[in-house]
C-alpha cells in the first residue's frame, strides 16, 4: 500500500470510509435493523462517488494528453475517473426513480394508476417486459446522444483547426492574379469595426525536395510582423523552442548557421524531442581554407517554415536544406526552365490537420515575391475578425470599405462550404438513422401496454363500472407508456451525458499516428441533448396511442365476462 501514489491512497481511504459510514448510518436509522434495497443502493452510490472524487483529483496531477508519452497507468486513471463518474450518475438516477414514482402516485387518477402499474412487482413476466422496454429506450437514447456528441466534437475540432490556420476573411482577385496596391486595402480593412488583424500574402504551388524525397507543397509568403494577428502559426511551431520568437530563424536566417547544440530541431510522433547535438571539433590547420569555410559555416539560405508531416516526408529537421522547384521559371534556349532555389528549414509547425502539415510551407513575403517574380505584389489579403461565427456579417462591410469591383471578399464558411455542408448532412443523417433505434424500442412499449391491457382487463372493467370514462383510461395507459419511455430516456441521456462529459474532461487518448489527433474530441451541447430527449419522448408518446385506445375501447362486460 505504501508504494501507491498519494492520490490513489487518499481515494481508496475516502471510498471505504464513505461507504462504511453510510452503511452504519442506514443501519442506525433503520428501526428493524435491516438494510433495504434503496439503502444499499444509496450506500453504493456514495462509495462510487468517493472513488470518482479520488480519480478526478488524481487526473489533475497527470501530464496533459497533448505532447506527453503514453503510459498505461495514466490511461487506467483516466478510465477509472470516467467509469466511476458514469456509475455514480446512473446510480443516482436509479435511486431517484422510486421518489419520482411516489410523486406521480400523489397526482391525478391517471398518473396514480399508471405509476402503480409500472412499479408492480407481482406481474412477473410483465415486469420483465417493462424492464426490457426501459432498457431498449435507454440504449437507443444513449447511442444517439453519444454519437451526436462525438460527431459534434469532430466538427468543432475541425472548425477550430481551420480557423486557427486560415483567415476568417480572404480578399483576392476574381482572376486569382497578383495585385500591387494592397497597402491601401489593408488600411481600409483595418478601419472596419470588428476587424482585429489583416496581413498580405503571396501563394504559389511548387515542388519541395530534399536529398531523400520530394513532395508537392503550397508556399505562403507572409509578413512575420502581422501574421500572428490573423493565424496561429507562432503558437503551432513546435521546433525550435529555445528562441523567444518562434519565427526568429525565419526573419534572421543567418541564425541558422549557428544553432545551439541543445536546440530542439524536431519532434517525434510520441512527443520525443530531437536536439541538434554538439558542434564538430575544431578543424586542423592543414585543411584547405575553402573546404574549411564550407564545413565551418553552412551557406546562408532563406528560411522556410514547414509542417511536421512534410518534415517526415522529406526527412529534414531545423537547419537542413530544402529545394523548391517551380514550373513557372525563366525562358531559356530550351523553352521555359523550372526555377529552383534552396532554402533552410527555419521552423517546424504542427497544426493538427494532416492536409496542412504535409502541404503548407511559409517564407517571408519579400522572399516569396522574389521567387514568384511578383515584386511589390500579393495574391491575397488575410483578415481576422473578433467573432469568427459572424464573419459573414462583416463581409459586406469589408466590401463597402475597399470599394473595389475587381476584388472579391469571401469568409471562411464560403471557402469551406462543401466541407461543412457535408458535415451537416452527415450529422442530420446520423440523427435520423439512430432515431430508428428509438422507434424500434418504442415497439416494446406498445407490446408492454397491450400485455398490460390483457392482464388488467378485469381492473379496467371495474374502473369503468365505477364511473371511469374512456378518456381517463386512455390517459392512464398513455401516461404509463410515457413513464416507461421517460425512465428509459432519462437513463440513456443521463448516461450519455455523464460519459461524454467525462471523456471531454479527462480525455480518451488516441494514437496520433493513426487518427492524427491525440484524444477523442467530444462536444457536449445542451441543445443536442434537449433535442434527443424531446425526440425520444415524442416517439414514445406516439407509440402509446394505439394500445391506449385499445384499452379505452374495452367494454366492462368483456372484462368481467369470465369472472
Give the ranges of each region predicted by the language model.
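Short helix-loop junctions at transmembrane helix boundaries
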Residues: 2-10, 52-86, 490-531, 545, ...
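Peri-transmembrane interface segments
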Residues: 2-10, 76-77, 123, 128, ...
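Hydrophobic alpha-helical transmembrane segments of multi-pass inner-membrane transport and secretion
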Residues: 9-12, 125-152, 424-459, 482-491, ...
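A structural signal for hydrophobic secondary-structure junctions
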Residues: 183-356, 362, 369-374
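N-terminal Sec/SRP start-transfer signal
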Residues: 93, 97-140
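C-terminal membrane-exit region of the final transmembrane helix in multipass inner-membrane proteins
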Residues: 20-32, 97-102, 106, 525-563
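Membrane-interface junction motifs in transport/secretion proteins
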Residues: 151, 155-187, 203
